[in-house]
Amino acid sequence: MENLSHLLDGFANIVSPINLLMALIGVVAGTAVGVLPGIGPAMTVALLLPITYGLEPTQAFILFAGIYYGGMYGGSTTSILLNTPGESSSVVTAIEGNLMAKAGRAAQALATAAIGSFVAGTLATLALVFVTPVVVDFAVGLGSPDYFAIMMLAFLAVSIVLGTSRVRGFASLLVGLVIGLIGIDRVTGQQRLTLGIPELADGIDVVVVAVGIFAVGEALWVAAHLRRKSVAVIPVGRPWLSRQDWRRSWKPWLRGAALGFPFGAVPAGGAEVPTFLSYAAEKKLTKHPEEFGKGAIEGVAGPEAANNASAAGSLVPMLAIGLPTTAVAAVMLAAFESYGIQPGPLLFEREPILVWTLIASLFLGNLLLLVLNLPLAPAWARLLRIPRHYLYAGILFFASMGAYAVNAKPLDLVLLLLLGLLGFGMRRFGFPVLPLIVGVILGPRAELQGRRSLQLSGGELSGLIGGPVSYTIYAIIALILLWPLLRRLPIFTKPRRPA
Amino acid sequence: MTLEAEEIRGKDRAQYGVCAFLALTGVAVIFDALRITHLTSSNDPIGPRPVPVILGIALLVTAVIYAVDVARGGRGEPEAGEDVDLTTPVDRRTVLLLVGFFLANAALIEPLGWVISGAVLFWGSAFALGNRHHVRGLVIAGALSLGTFYAFAIGLGVNLPAGVLQGIL
């Protein structure tokens, strides 16, 4: 129950006019940016990072929590009304959601997404309150070899398990790791890959990488293939649900939340798998199977809840171990670092006020989102009509501003462009961007932990294998790597029964 | 997803360029690692070299595997999106114009200040993307760059240079 008292302290910290205002600004800005076509949650968070720069950490993170949930909600609005999801995690929501919108039930689709996000987000954040301290207790006992193993697992998970192509995911990861290598080696002070440019000695700021890959890369990619016809936007009224919609939605919300949270919380989870599972489950359990494929409300309620719950779940490894498993968590980690705060087991000891205020503001952001967005949905939908040349010009404008503001170095703008071109190339050739971002962020830490492990063993490679934790993780890694071979074994190749 | 018209004919050969990029990066990383002084100590038995060397080798191996994948007809699916029309070829002119305005911003931001360079960036990008309302574009650009300057540089203390307008703003 200690957690609950911490959480109450967190709530007590939020309830000041200025902090409430921060949460409100965050939710509004996050939704407004997230709803813009082509801007997913990760890009929203990266683009809006600069507005937190001048603030003290606590307020910055309250604002940030609002931006995060606002961006997620905005993304689902876009996918329901336009049917072309910006992020892979909203793909499933878009299927039935857009069909509902086309059938004249856009208001109900948005309502079940909004209320479902609220329910699932609240439940998952509550789960986070109880699970995170347990993970922290576990993580406190971990040594460098264990951390090294966990990071290896995270690398494999984001590059091999989550993507569609192993070789492309792995290549993306390696490029990210190389970018993370740039700068002065923290242990020996040797310059690596700096090409003699003094500004590169500190490495490339993660914010610059994230904004370059997400925002600039996306803007350039869209510019190269800009659809000249305007996209049809489905008009929407104020979202509401009838009694029957409620009856059909509440179970999918709860099931979605239950599926999403655990997937988000494990390093190899992500949001794609639980949203697909939730969709499949709802399709099977529904009393209205005839509506699936024509706009079934369960098909929006479940996946959207799963998406939100997994987003909250992904904060568990991020806060407790310092391990980002989604692009948003990766950007968030970068934000923590820009305040000199190191997520990980010690975070809860060193910055209890900050962490618990952050968690409390997740609840608050969720609530504000619901209160604000139900009445404001028609206004957000209007943002979808923004002329595309202004939209993408604006993305480049804010991306430049944010990247320059990090260090006030014009060279960062050149790097931003180069990274944007890299992001362009990755989109052209179908490379996933998540492994790259995770590589940039975790690469230097993995090297540090690996070298620490070897320091303890005097350079013997056996030092990398610590205790039971790392044994277990290496066993999982071996399973992941060997899975394509194992799958062909007779026990896995039984003829499948039709589902 | 339907295949792009230009790609139906055969493999997406441009992917070999990506292999070359990965391989070259790998070689560059290894060379850079061999250039740095190899320092080891009891505190740090492996030094700064092994990690880049391992990454470089991994990049080379990945480049080869990728090339094999491409030769077998593998292709990555270009990213779709709300405003993306994959049936059109890459619009080089737009992309080059955007790159140009982007670099102009990088060059002008310190001498002229964010208000001017940012406005140039916005106006130019909108122009490159097909905006033909030049005056309206300029008004929006000016409003955005002034607005962000006052809100962020003056309001929040974010680093944005005033440039030649120092003292006026």
Can you name each region flagged by the protein language model?
Chain A
Residues 68-79, 86, 296-321, 325, ...:
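A structural-propensity feature for long, helix-poor, extended segments
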Residues 69-74, 115-127, 135, 179, ...:
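Membrane-embedded alpha-helical segments of transport systems
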Residues 41-51, 64, 79-99, 130, ...:
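Re-entrant/interfacial helical elements at transmembrane boundaries that shape
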Residues 33-42, 80-91, 124-127, 263-272, ...:
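Short helix-coil transition sites and intra-membrane helix breaks within transmembrane domains
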Residues 111-227, 338-489:
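Membrane-embedded alpha-helical modules
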Residues 1-60, 133, 139-140, 191-296, ...:
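Helix-loop-helix hairpins and the membrane-proximal interhelical loops
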Residues 58-62, 99-116, 287-300, 327-330, ...:
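Membrane-interface alpha-helices at helix entry/exit sites of multi-pass transporters
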Residues 27-41, 70-83, 158-163, 258-267, ...:
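Transmembrane alpha-helix interface/packing and boundary motifs in multi-pass membrane proteins
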